[in-house]
Amino acid sequence: MYKRQGIIVQEISKIISFKKVIIISSVKSMHEYPIHMQISRKTKAYKIFPVNWIDDFEAFVGFIFGPLARKQMEHSRKYLSYRDPFYLEWALDAFFNWKQKKPLNYVIHIHGTYDMVFPIIYLKEFIPVKSGTHAMIIFKKKWFNENLPKIIMDD
């Protein structure tokens, strides 16, 4: 699952039994959050972030970082288009207050080595995707087409 959905599927797996759960570009426990997210969690700073800034932020990132970032933002907008403010506030609160202290032993974690949202320095036990970014599920489709079937079928 992708980003927040990785957290959601791990919570679902506590209710519905699975042989394995695969997460992509996500985290396995709250201890894998980068330091700035951990600080935001402890101070509740995320609550002062107006969720309607998300659209403005995407435009800003595209302007500052150029065509590649703009292309990633367009993909993000296409695949993450549900932007109801109440949902976004709930999602941020749920994300920052996730209480998973230890990774679940059946979670398989696939993560890009260039992910700037969840840098690999904070992660333990994951399958690295060389040069993969946080949006690698879109841009590294060849890697996923070649490797995901093996990961799924492997015992």
Please provide the spans of the model-predicted regions:
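Conserved alpha/beta-hydrolase catalytic His-Asp/Glu region
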Residues: 53-99
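Flexible "cap/lid" loop of the alpha/beta hydrolase fold
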Residues: 15-52
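Conserved small/polar residues in nucleotide/adenosyl-binding loops
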Residues: 1-5
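Short loop/helix-cap segments at secondary-structure boundaries that form the rim of catalytic
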Residues: 13-15, 102-104, 116-125
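Conserved beta-strand scaffold positions in the cores of enzyme catalytic domains, especially
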Residues: 21, 107-109, 124-128
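Catalytic active-site module of serine/aspartate enzymes centered on a nucleophile-bearing elbow/loop
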Residues: 127-155
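Short beta-strand/loop motif that positions the catalytic acidic residue
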Residues: 109-111, 115
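Hydrolases whose catalytic domains are alpha/beta-hydrolase-1, hotdog thioesterase
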Residues: 7-12
